[in-house]
Design a protein with these regions (language model features):
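A glycine-rich beta-to-alpha transition motif near the start of alpha/beta enzyme domains, typified by
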Residues: 1-139, 149-315
Length: 315
């Protein structure tokens, strides 16, 4: 099988995009997982594109390397896709003309996901509407948990851990560097998470509220599967989950000039290597609804690149 691909990243979250029309029926998952493997394109997620249906511009299926299955959402993929559609010929491949001001409607398993293209000249950026994923979180529920003796939150399918909980349990650990003791602790908590939560998946976020640069709110990293060395320096869905957990835990407050119902704009330090935080910024906007729930969610990332384009040959 010979398939065209384009690869990129969002702050180190590596993404490969494939043309689904080139994949044999019934082998989409198998081939995508092979492409994600270190022997081929070494990526965290794959996006399989098809022409749009039911009013959407594109239909998107998503494969996660950590979970080894189709998944409902991937924010990093939508950010890379925005860059791909504005800087390569893949927009024309699907008969799309994408420019500043365009809104591209993606048909995903989570529902219609709009991405808005903005910028000046050739410098494009993408804002992803994550409201459908936010709804998935609330549908699956949010709850505090005690795992391996430490507090955490289940936010939908995500396990969200505040790094201070690792510091309390491991006084000698440098948790922000994900040292050996911190990794063992995270693995133990995740193993208990799998036992206790039917919603559990390979979706894990570590954060704290000790940013190193003024104007930022949180630091994040996403060690989805430490035993498999699958650690994402940035993650769109994980960033939304972190903000929901931080609100629930009281580390963030909804505030603004419009009062309690003002949109909450947050900056998360991310990207770079396998440390908590990083040189990039993930921007999250949450719009409050009724009660204590958020009604809408949006995000963008400061560092999105297309890294290569070509063809892959697989057996």
């Amino acid at each position: 099988v010979i398939i065209d691909f384009v690869k990129g990243h969002m702050g180190g979250n590596t993404i490969t995009i494939l043309d689904g029309r080139q994949l044999p029926d019934g082998r989409e998952l198998e081939i995508s997982l092979a492409v994600l493997d270190d022997r081929y394109l070494c990526s965290h997620e794959a996006g399989i594109l098809y022409p749009g249906e039911e009013g959407c511009d594109l239909t998107l299926r998503i494969v996660g390397r950590a979970s080894r299955k189709f998944i409902s959402a991937c924010g990093g993929l939508t950010q890379v896709l925005g860059k791909v559609l504005t800087s390569t010929g893949w927009g024309r491949r699907f008969a799309l003309s994408v420019h500043v001001g365009s809104t591209v409607l993606l048909g995903t398993p989570a529902g219609v996901t709009p991405i808005l293209i903005s910028g000046e000249g050739a410098d494009f950026s993408t804002e992803t509407d994550m409201t459908q994923f936010l709804g998935e979180i609330y549908q699956q529920g949010i709850e505090p948990m005690v795992l391996d003796g430490s507090r955490s939150w289940r936010v939908g399918k995500f396990l969200v851990i505040h790094a201070d909980e690792l510091r309390k349990a491991l006084p000698g650990s440098v948790a922000e560097n994900l040292d050996e003791s911190a990794r063992h602790k995270i693995v133990a908590m995740q193993e208990e998470f799998f036992l206790k939560s039917p919603q559990a998946g390979f979706d894990l976020a570590l954060y704290d509220d000790h940013p190193v640069r003024q104007g930022n709110d949180l630091r994040v990293i996403f060690p989805h599967s430490i035993p498999k060395n699958l650690i994402e320096p940035s993650c769109g869905t994980g960033s939304i989950a972190v903000c929901i957990a931080a609100l629930a835990d009281g580390f963030l407050k909804v505030k603004g000039s419009s009062g309690e119902n003002a949109a909450l704009s947050l900056q998360l330090e991310s990207g770079g290597g396998y440390d908590l935080g990083g040189p990039d910024v993930t921007r999250v906007t949450l719009v409050p609804g009724k009660g204590h729930r958020m009604e809408e969610a949006f995000f963008s990332h400061s560092n999105v690149e297309v890294t290569c384009e070509g063809r892959a040959s697989l057996a």
